[in-house]
Amino acid sequence: MTAPPLPASEPTPSATAILWADPQRAAAFQNWLAGIGPAHGLLPATVRLASADASFRRYFRIDATGSAASRIVMDAPPEKENSEPFVQVARLMAEAGVTAPQVLEWDRTHGFLLLDDLGRETMLDVIDPARPDASRPLYDQAIDALIRWQLASRPGVLPPYDRALLERELALFPEWYIGRHRGIAVEGQIKERLERSFRLIVESNLASPSVYVHRDFMPRNLMVRDGADLGVLDFQDAVYGPITYDIA
């Protein structure tokens, strides 16, 4: 999943230096950047780390001339990360009228993508739990974007959020939270109650109408932009599943 961008204030160069474990990949990146740079007004000397996530993907920010102050580069080694779902879902979101990073260039062989930059400020950065009414316009925007996304849904386009996937994700709760975080053995009555509850959840979800599901639709993945709709990130794991999933 995509980590939040680094803070709005520019970090020191040492904090954003790009390190490469593979010199050949580093050379391929430099060659690719030099090749696409002129068409997009990129300034290669300004490339720096923007964020990383729990996968093998990394994101760099690079300055550009003209109206685009900066662009984002995704580094997704193809032997570790498949970029095709990201490209597909970015296109689906654009078709639905949802603001997501536009894929400007894609080196499929090496897994390098040039994206437009939706900024540094997430919705999580600006909402104030102590003043819920002040955050209502942002939540309204988020719901509007979600509705547009759902209304564009078509079966057979995205992978199904089927029983196997639901059960796999539910199993994370007893394993990681109850077992590892709380140190409680999942057995006896606890196990029976969980299994009974999980069966109800699975059946309820499978009986719901199916739409496009982002799967990580939350404030840290929504970008606040002055005078524009919220931008949506971290959508590459989207599926076709229960209509209630994202809004929950």
Task: Specify the residue positions occupied by each region the protein language model found.
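An alpha-helical support segment within catalytic cores of ATP-dependent transferases
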Residues: F29, I36-P38, R154-P160, A164-L165, ...
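Catalytic-loop signature of eukaryotic-like protein kinases
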Residues: R220-L222
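ATP-binding glycine-rich phosphate-binding loop
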Residues: L42-F60
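Conserved catalytic-loop position in the HRD/HxD motif
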Residues: D216
